[in-house]
Design a protein with these regions (language model features):
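Divalent-metal (often Zn2+) His-rich catalytic cores of metallo-beta-lactamase-fold enzymes
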Residues: 181-239
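Glycine-rich, phosphate-binding/catalytic loops in enzymes
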Residues: 78-80, 104-106, 177-179, 214-217
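Catalytic core of the metallo-beta-lactamase
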Residues: 10-75, 79-84, 119-185
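Glycine-rich nucleotide phosphate-binding loop and flanking beta-alpha elements
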Residues: 68, 95, 116, 204-205
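Histidine-centered catalytic micro-motifs
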Residues: 87-97, 140-148, 199-202
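Active-site metal-binding motif and surrounding structural segment of the metallo-beta-lactamase
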Residues: 68-111, 193-196
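N-terminal non-globular leader segments, chiefly Sec-dependent signal peptides
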Residues: 4-12, 195-198
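Active-site flanking residues adjacent to catalytic metal/cofactor-binding acidic residues
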Residues: 62, 90, 110-111, 161-164, ...
Length: 239
């Protein structure tokens, strides 16, 4: 696996566009810590970050992507570590769940909306806590404009994996945030002990939580009175 990536990005960056050369590479392994690695995202086909948390007995995999070589990559690390795989799916979009049918897993956790697409595994309706010697995990529901029924994964109270939960929704030709949901997200992040959050398709993958909160607060400040939706345009999207 690749060398440790930097954790101290000062500002949140925009989603990489299709011309970014990093997205034209094959997905590869990168390390965050000695227990936390991930497979990089791709654009063609669109494939999300695949995170792997190594516990005492299992490899906890958050999202499985859509790129065709990811199941083989996960099978190889499972074999090397001698540990079975447990999967958490952030939400139902294909770039996050398409490979689930090609992966051998012990358990599969997802929101109710995601289950409508997979028809397998367990629906998470309340927090799931995993308490091991070196790894402490919490799987919990995260409100989202982008995808109803999203799940987040908190790792050792330091890293919170959010998938696409903080991104806007697309309603017809409009890109929008639900103002009420956005406020809930900001409040959840502020109460969370973790100093870092991880958003799919972003670079760097690990972001300072406070930078992300500031980004969301700029969007929330654009809301109009008595309007449930915040319209995003090319002119008002904050950096």
């Amino acid at each position: 696996m690749a060398a440790d990536m930097r954790e101290n990005s000062a500002e949140i960056t925009k989603i990489q566009d299709v011309d970014n050369s990093n997205n034209k590479q094959f997905p590869t392994w990168k390390c965050v810590t000695d227990y936390f690695s991930y497979i990089t995202p791709a654009i063609k086909p669109l494939s999300a970050n695949v995170s792997v948390i190594e516990g005492e007995k299992y490899l906890w995999v958050y999202d499985v992507g859509s790129y065709e070589n990811i199941p083989e990559m996960l099978a190889e690390i499972s074999k090397q570590k001698g540990k079975k795989i447990k999967i958490i799916l952030s939400h139902f979009h294909p770039d996050h769940i398409a490979n689930v049918q090609h992966i051998k897993w012990e358990s599969l956790y997802q929101g109710k909306n995601t289950y409508k697409y997979t028809h397998i595994g367990e629906i998470v309706e309340s927090d799931i806590n995993v308490d091991e010697t070196d790894i402490k995990l919490r799987i919990f529901q995260m409100p989202s404009s982008h995808a109803k029924g999203s799940l987040a994964l908190l790792v050792n109270n330091k890293y919170c994996l959010l998938g696409d939960a903080l991104y806007p929704a697309h309603k017809g030709d409009k890109t929008v945030y639900n103002a009420g949901i956005l406020k809930q997200q900001i409040d959840i992040l502020k109460k969370m002990a973790a100093p870092y959050v991880l958003l799919s398709h972003r670079e760097p993958f690990v972001q300072k939580k406070q930078a992300v909160i500031s980004w969301l607060e700029k969007i929330y400040a654009m809301r109009e009175k008595n309007e449930p939706w915040i319209l995003m345009t090319g002119q008002n999207v904050p950096n």
